[in-house]
Amino acid sequence: MVVLDASALLAWFGGEPGADQVEQHMPCCCSTANWAEVVQKLTARGVGLGDIRSAVSLLGLVLEPVTTEDAETAATLWQDHPTLSLGDRLCLALGHRLAVPVLTADRAWSNQPPIVQIR
């Protein structure tokens, strides 16, 4: 199991570089905070919510709610990672809580464990 950040999930939806790496890590999970970002970006491009849900069912995507622990971890991550958004830090917090790697297509993230950059 791995955690996908919004950029990795969007890369998969768009058939962009790294999409194959996302598929190799099925089943996977995503924070509901990152899910909101994915849905917002795809619906802005004209993709229907039903189509989005159908597509992610192929991934075996599990949506994990943001917990109080995740929120507190994300808040403390700000000190070491001030350039990461709240959504990014919530993604990292979920990976920390589940003790699994986090896949991202975002080049701004480091490539240190538990972060795996897809290309």
Model-derived segments and spans:
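Acidic catalytic patch
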Residues: S57-H81
